[in-house]
């Protein structure tokens, strides 16, 4: 008689348990643990001796600056390193990283952070890392103080659809402000952004039609799906660059000089892929400075 699937599964599971009990437990973790190495033992002793007695976030300044140097060297002098603020949400820490990395370019993901950046970093060049609801743009202007930071020159607002651009356009007219627009493009992630270059053409026409309130600042292509790639020659990387290049062709056809625009991409996981590629001139990274073990890969 044929054995039922359920009975076979139960029998098989019982056999595995029996084998585990009867033999050695191969999946059991080792009982022997190891002490911390000298570095972490020293930190542990320091915190026991001088720490506040509650959990803290500890940043090793020497190692942080070493990581900053590595990233700055990878980006190179011909491109802009844009520091991701959400990965380093501390004004003194940002000051240290920006000074060491010789950059004033920041990527911001949160309206309250944007207002802090405008106040604390009056010379910053800011690109929004995600499209903000139009209410957040309104709130930014409502919460502004008397700082010398000039949003019309120093912020690139990210838009991902013609509809969002229309909302931003209406707000710019209402408030009497000028918005620099950076277009989020889909380069293979398929999780937002303009799906094809034809959509960008119509948006560029709207922007060109009202230079008092709008101007075009560049492109942003988010590509975390390339995490794990080790060479710019890999097909997935080439496909992403090909998609990006098609959008660049459209902005060139519209009369823009790409070299004068922000062509942003990358992240800590993919930054080094583009060391020998000059399509993008603006590369973002932040987490790799303070979470190096997350990025301890063959590429990095």
Regions found by a protein language model. Name each.
Residues 13, 180, 186-300:
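Active-site loop/helix belt of alpha/beta enzymes
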């Amino acid at each position: 008689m044929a054995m039922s699937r359920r009975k076979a599964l139960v029998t098989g599971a019982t056999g595995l348990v029996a084998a585990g009990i009867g033999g050695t437990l191969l999946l059991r973790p080792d009982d022997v643990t190891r002490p911390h190495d000298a570095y972490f033992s020293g930190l542990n002793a320091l915190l026991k001796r001088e720490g506040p007695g509650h959990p803290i976030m500890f940043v090793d300044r020497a190692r942080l600056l070493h990581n900053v140097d590595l990233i700055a060297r990878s980006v190179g002098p011909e491109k802009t390193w844009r520091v991701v603020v959400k990965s380093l949400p501390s004004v003194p820490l940002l000051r240290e990283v920006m000074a060491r990395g010789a950059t004033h370019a920041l990527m911001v993901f949160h309206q309250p952070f944007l207002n802090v950046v405008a106040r604390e970093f009056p010379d910053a060049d800011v690109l929004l890392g995600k499209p903000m609801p139009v209410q957040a743009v309104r709130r930014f202007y409502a919460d502004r103080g008397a700082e010398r930071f000039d949003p019309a020159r120093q912020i690139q607002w990210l838009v991902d659809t013609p509809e969002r651009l229309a909302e931003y356009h209406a707000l710019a007219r209402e408030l009497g402000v000028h918005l620099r627009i950076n277009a989020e493009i889909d380069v293979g992630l398929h999780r937002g952004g303009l799906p094809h270059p034809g959509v960008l053409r119509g948006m560029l026409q709207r922007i060109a039609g009202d230079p008092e309130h709008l101007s075009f600042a560049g492109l942003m292509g988010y590509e975390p799906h390339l995490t794990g790639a080790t060479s710019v020659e890999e097909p997935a990387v080439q496909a992403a660059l090909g998609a990006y290049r098609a959008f660049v062709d459209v902005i060139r056809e519209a009369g823009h000089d790409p070299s004068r625009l922000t062509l942003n991409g990358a992240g800590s996981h993919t930054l080094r892929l583009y060391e020998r590629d000059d399509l993008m001139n603006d590369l973002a990274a932040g987490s790799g400075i303070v979470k190096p073990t997350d990025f301890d890969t063959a590429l990095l």
